[in-house]
Amino acid sequence: MDAANLVMKSSMFSKSPCPVFGSKLIPRAPPSVFTLPSTFRPLVKCIQASFPQNPDSKIPSNNSTFTCSAVTSFPSQQSQPHATSDAKLQLLISEFQSLVEPMDRVKRLLHYSTLIPSMDASLKTPENRVLGCTTQVWLHVSFDEAENRMKFVADSDSDITKGFCACLVSLLDGATPDEVLALKTEDLNALNVAGLNGKGSASRANTWHNVLVSMQKRTRALVAEREGRPRNELFPSLVITADGIQPQGSYAEAQARFLFPDESRVQELASLLKEKKIGVVAHFYMDPEVQGVLTAAQKLWPHIHISDSLVMADKAVSMAKAGCEYISVLGVDFMSENVRAILDLAGFPEVGVYRMSDERIGCSLADAAASPAYLDYLKTASTSSPSLHVVYINTSLETKAYSHELVPTITCTSSNVVQTILQAFAEVPDLEVLYGPDTYMGSNIAELFTQMSTMTDEEISEIHPLHNRSSIKSLLPRLHYFQDGTCIVHHLFGHEVVENINEMYGDAFLTAHFEVPGEMFSLAMEAKKRGMGVVGSTSNILDFIKERVEEALNRNVDEHLQFVLGTESGMITAIVAAVGKLLGSADTSSGGAKVSVEIVFPVSSESVTRTSTGSSLDQNKVNIIPGVASGEGCSLHGGCASCPYMKMNSLSSLLRVCQSLPHGKAELSAYEAGRFSLQTPNGKQIADVGCEPVLHMRHFQATKRLPEQLINQILQRSSSA
C-alpha cells in the first residue's frame, strides 16, 4: 500500500498536535482513506476511544465512543529547506513534554519507529554497531557532496530504540556537518522520552547520547577525509577474544609478548622462591615481563601477590605467618618502607624486606608530599579549626608521621577517598578538610562535589546517606587540596590525548583513574553519565570492564567492545586474565555469539623521558630511568602510559635478589628496606606515628565511620589552637 494512503489502527491518541511531524487530528465517523500531497510521508492512525463517566460530572454519560484518524506527516527536506537542527530539536522537546503520561511518550516513540524504513541487511555490520545500547543499534553515515549535508540511516532490533533513532535522524539527516557537531549530549536531557521509573529506564535515555556521539564521530571522520586532512593516528591497543589476544600497534605488541612468559623463567623463579621461602608482593604498575612471570608462577608458589599498594603490606604479614623468611617488594621505595614497618608492628622483625634496585626508586607524588612546600601547606591550614588531613596512601611514612603531628591525619586510596571525606564532613561540624598531595585527584574530587551539588537529595544519598544538596554546597568552601603535586604518569593524559580520544574514541567506553588530569576526568565523567564510563581506582576500572563483558555475553550477539584505559598500562595483565576467563567460559562452540574486547592505551606524544630534566628527578639523583622514547612515543620499559620508577623492578633484579639469599646479605645491603631510626619533632618514632593514619583508614574501611580516637584528635587540636 502507498505510504500516502496508509491506514493503521492504534490505541495511541493525543490531544496535542505533533509539531515536528505535523500531526493533526481529523474527527470522522467510519474510517476512510486520506490522500496527502507528495511532499509529506504520512502515517494515518485510526483511534477508537471510550470515555468513562466522571463521578463529579453533571453531564450524563451515554458510554459513547468516537473514532478519528491522526495524520502524522514527516516533512521532506524540500518542504522545510531552512529548518535548522536546533529548531527541530525545540519542536521535538515541546512535543514530548506536552505528553504528561510516561506511557504516552513511549507510545509516541513507538509511533516514530514506524516512520523510518528498515536498514538494508548489508549495512548491519559490526562496524556500524553503536556501543553502549542495551539492544542492537546500527548507524550508517554518508556525506552528500553536492549539498554539503550529512545523511544518516539507523535501525535497531528494539522498537523503542528504533524510535530514538528515528527522532535523531529527523533532527540531523540533511544537516550540515557544523550543525551535527554543534549538538551537545546535554541538549537531549529534556527528551526524557521513556519516562519510566522501572529498571532499564536510564539505559533507554542513554540511547540518545550514545547514538548522537556515534553520529558525530563518524561525521568528523568523513569531513576530515573530504578535506584531505590526515586523521589522528589510532592509539595502540590489545584485542582479547576467547581464542587469545591480538596486539595492535608496537606498544601493545610489546605488552603482549610478556603476557605469556617463557616457561623456563617461570619455573626458575618459582623454584627459587620455594627453596628459599621468599614471598613476593608487587604493585599493579610494574614491568609487564615481571607481571607475566609472577602471574604464571603463582600456580607453583602461592606466596605471590599483585595488588594496589594498600594490600601489599597486609599480604606480606600473611606470608610471614605462613613461614616466609624474606619478602621481595616490587614497587617504589615508600611501599617497601611500609612493608618493613607493618611487619615490625606485626611482630616479624626477623623477616627481611628487599627492594629491587640499589638506587633510589622514587615516586613523584611521594616526593611532592615530602617537599617543604607541602609541610608549609599543612602548617598554614592547620590554623583553621577543626581540621583533618586526608593523605593519599602513596606517600612515605615520614610524610604521614610529620603530617599527623601537624594536623590529625587519615590515609586514603582512590577507592575510598570520596567516602572518607564525605564521612568526615558528616561527623565533624564545621570541619576543614585538607587533601594531598595529588593535585589532579584533589581538583577532580572538588569537581565531583560541585557536580553533586546540582543533584537531587535522593541521588546524593545514593553516594552518601548522610548528605544532601544543602550539606554538599556547604562543604565546598571547606575542602582544600595541595596545588603542586603531580603523578608524572597521569600528567601525560593532557589536552592532546583528550582531543584524540574525542575524535577517534568518542563512542568507546572510557575509564579514568581519580588521579588523571581534569580534561580526561571530565571526559570520563560525561561518558559515565550515559553509561559509557567509569571514574575510580584500578579495581573500579577492572570491575567496570568485567561487568560490560558479562552484559555482552548475556545478550548473546556478536559484539566488539572497546575500552580506553585511562590509567597506567601496567594493569593490562589483570584485565587480560579477567576478560579472558569470562570469554573462555562462554559457549561459542555451538554457534554462540562471539564477543571481542579491545583495550586501548591512550599514549601521549610526550614521553615520560621529558621528566628526566624535571626537578623531582634531578633533586634525587636518579640518573638512569629505564624506558627511553621510541616508536609510538613509548617503549617496553617506560613510555607515556608506563611509570618509569615502577619499571626499575626488573625480572633480572628479582632473580638476582632471590639467588643471593640467604648467604649474600652483605651484597644486598643497598637493596634492603631499612628501619626508621629518626624521630618526629615531638620525639616519637616515625614508624609508630606514620602507621597511625593507616590504622585510622582501616578502622574506617571496617566500620564506615571515623575512629573515635581520630575525632578526639581533631577536636583536641581545635581546642588547643
From Swiss-Prot:
Taxonomy, superkingdom: Eukaryota
- Which N-terminal residues, if any, form the signal peptide? none
The top EC class, named as a word, is transferase
Q: Name one GO cellular component term.
A: chloroplast
Q: Which InterPro entries does this chain map to?
A: Fe-S_metab-assoc_dom, NadA, NadA_sf
Which cofactors go with this protein? [4Fe-4S] cluster
Q: Where in the cell is it found?
A: Plastid, Chloroplast
Transit peptide span?
1-67
UniProt entry keywords in alphabetical sequence: 4Fe-4S, Alkaloid metabolism, Chloroplast, Iron, Iron-sulfur, Metal-binding, Plastid, Pyridine nucleotide biosynthesis, Transferase, Transit peptide
Enzyme Commission (EC) number: 2.5.1.72
Cite the annotated pathway.
Alkaloid biosynthesis; nicotine biosynthesis; Cofactor biosynthesis; NAD(+) biosynthesis; quinolinate from iminoaspartate: step 1/1
Reactions performed catalytically: iminosuccinate + dihydroxyacetone phosphate = quinolinate + phosphate + 2 H2O + H(+)
Q: Name one GO biological process term.
A: alkaloid metabolic process
Biological role stated in the UniProt entry: Involved in the biosynthesis of pyridine alkaloid natural products, leading mainly to the production of anabasine, anatabine, nicotine and nornicotine, effective deterrents against herbivores with antiparasitic and pesticide properties (neurotoxins); nornicotine serves as the precursor in the synthesis of the carcinogen compound N'-nitrosonornicotine (NNN). Catalyzes the condensation of iminoaspartate with dihydroxyacetone phosphate to form quinolinate.
Which family does the UniProt entry place this protein in?
Answer: Belongs to the quinolinate synthase family. Type 1 subfamily.
Protein name per UniProt: Quinolinate synthase, chloroplastic
Origin organism of this chain? Answer: Nicotiana tabacum
Identify the coding gene.
QS
